[in-house]
């Protein structure tokens, strides 16, 4: 029996829609772009290249046909500018709002810019999408919203206090989305991402995520630093699972809308386990790394453990993650080796 996602992938090429991806030059945005263009959809992309890269768009172009690429319209603009948002939303059926300044440490160092992008920018996008009468608005929420609540697995309706300015911004997004559905009858779905990883996730810069950062260090023969004792755990989610969730959410029925969903695999991996998984993944691709990890202080604003209950997304969206951590690492490694060597 076909999964809901497999059915959707069959349906979409027969009835192309217009999709807007904000943050299209970023990690998740460029993977959404690749999938939608390969499904013969029309895509508008908005990005200001604050954290996204032209090279991600160039890579997508190399992976699709010229005809598919001609279905893509890129707008260089900023979600903090309402005119840019209005321009991007014109004639769009589905919005996939990924643009944001990620990273807990970045938000601690510069809460004002995080607020301007993640809250003011989000509100601009809601207004523009509402006024353009789009069919649905799917946005990147975050597992950071669970804050200091100790319960595992994380269930959507039980959250704690935020532990960082970033977590505050992502929670405010959920509140605004909920209010827009109540006040304006506007359909939104929030996807609480848990530690997404995969191809095109940037290994460079001060705020690189753990998997690309460690992989880069290993390939270059540098030390790998673990904050804390290494028993901190996360629910790592390969990018293809996240793409699946976005497409299912955008096209979901009315009963599934105006809610938030955990998007993960529902499995916990400690940082120590992750270290060995990455080392093994590199070894399978002919890259050896013989150093042991270097442990240092636990990082401010980080939660100790994270594990998602994904039953709500499974039930209401038909979400069925296909890739666990080891499968995701196996798929991502050749890309990292090519990119970093």
UniProtKB/Swiss-Prot annotation:
Q: Where is the active site?
A: 166 (proton acceptor)
How this protein's activity responds to pH is stated as:
Optimum pH is between 7 and 8.
Pathway(s) per entry: Bacterial outer membrane biogenesis; LPS O-antigen biosynthesis
Which Pfam families does the record match to this protein? Epimerase
Keywords in alphabetical order, please. Answer: Cell wall biogenesis/degradation, Isomerase, Lipopolysaccharide biosynthesis, NAD, Nucleotide-binding
Annotated effect of mutating residue 209 to H: Alters substrate specificity. Mutant is much less efficient in catalyzing the epimerization of N-acetylated hexose moieties and is more efficient in catalyzing the reaction for non-acetylated hexoses
Q: Which metal ions or organic cofactors does this protein require, according to UniProt?
A: NAD(+)
Q: What is its EC number?
A: 5.1.3.45, 5.1.3.7
Known outcome of mutating residue 143 to A: Shows normal activity on N-acetylated substrates, but shows no activity on UDP-Gal and UDP-Glc
- Asked whether the keyword Endoplasmic reticulum is assigned, the reply is no
**Result for mutant: residue 209 to N:** Enhances the specificity for acetylated substrates, and this is accompanied by a decrease in catalytic efficiency. Strongly impaired in its ability to use non-acetylated substrates
- Influence of temperature on activity: Optimum temperature is between 37 and 42 degrees Celsius.
Q: Belongs to which family? A: Belongs to the NAD(P)-dependent epimerase/dehydratase family.
Functionally, this protein is described as follows: Epimerase required for the biosynthesis of the B-band O antigen of serotype O6 lipopolysaccharide. Catalyzes the reversible epimerization of UDP-N-acetylglucosaminuronic acid (UDP-GlcNAcA) to UDP-N-acetylgalactosaminuronic acid (UDP-GalNAcA). Also catalyzes the reversible epimerization of UDP-N-acetylglucosamine (UDP-GlcNAc) to UDP-N-acetylgalactosamine (UDP-GalNAc). Has very low epimerase activity with UDP-glucose (UDP-Glc) and UDP-galactose (UDP-Gal).
| Miscellaneous comment text of the record | Whereas either WbpO or WbpP could initiate the two-step biosynthetic pathway of UDP-GalNAcA, the kinetic parameters of the two enzymes indicate that WbpO acts preferentially before WpbP.
What's the protein name? UDP-N-acetyl-alpha-D-glucosaminouronate 4-epimerase
Supply the source organism for this entry: Pseudomonas aeruginosa
The opening ranks of the lineage are: Bacteria, Pseudomonadati, Pseudomonadota, Gammaproteobacteria, Pseudomonadales
Originating gene: wbpP
């Amino acid at each position: 029996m076909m999964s809901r996602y497999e059915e959707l992938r069959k349906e979409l090429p027969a009835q192309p829609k217009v999709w807007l991806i904000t943050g299209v030059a970023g990690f998740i945005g460029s993977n959404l772009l690749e999938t939608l263009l390969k499904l013969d959809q029309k895509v508008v992309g908005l990005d200001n290249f604050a954290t996204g890269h032209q090279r991600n768009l160039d890579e997508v172009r190399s992976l699709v046909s010229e005809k598919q690429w001609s279905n893509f319209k890129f707008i260089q603009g900023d979600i903090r500018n309402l005119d840019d948002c209005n321009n991007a939303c014109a004639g769009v059926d589905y919005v996939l709002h990924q643009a944001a300044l990620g990273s807990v440490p970045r938000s601690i160092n510069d809460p004002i810019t995080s607020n301007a992008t993640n809250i003011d920018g989000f509100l601009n996008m809601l207004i523009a999408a509402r006024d353009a009468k789009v069919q649905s608005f799917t946005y990147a929420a975050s597992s950071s919203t669970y804050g200091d609540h100790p319960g595992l697995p994380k269930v959507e309706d039980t959250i704690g206090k935020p532990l960082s300015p970033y977590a505050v911004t992502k929670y405010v997004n959920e509140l605004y989305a909920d209010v827009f559905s109540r006040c304006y009858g506007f359909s939104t779905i929030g996807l609480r991402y848990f530690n997404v990883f995969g191809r095109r996730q940037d290994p460079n810069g001060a705020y690189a995520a753990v998997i690309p950062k460690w992989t880069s260090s290993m390939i270059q023969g540098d030390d790998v630093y673990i904050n804390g004792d290494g028993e901190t755990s996360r629910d790592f989610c390969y990018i293809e699972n996240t793409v699946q969730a976005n497409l299912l959410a955008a096209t979901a029925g009315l009963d599934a809308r105006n809610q938030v969903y955990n998007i993960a695999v529902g499995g916990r991996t400690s940082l120590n386990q992750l270290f060995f998984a990455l080392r093994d993944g590199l070894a399978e691709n002919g890259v050896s790394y013989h150093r042991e990890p270097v442990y240092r202080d636990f990082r401010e604003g980080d939660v100790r453990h994270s594990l998602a209950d994904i039953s709500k997304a499974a039930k209401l969206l038909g979400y069925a993650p296909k890739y666990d951590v080891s499968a995701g690492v196996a798929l991502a490694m050749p890309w990292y080796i090519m990119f970093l060597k």
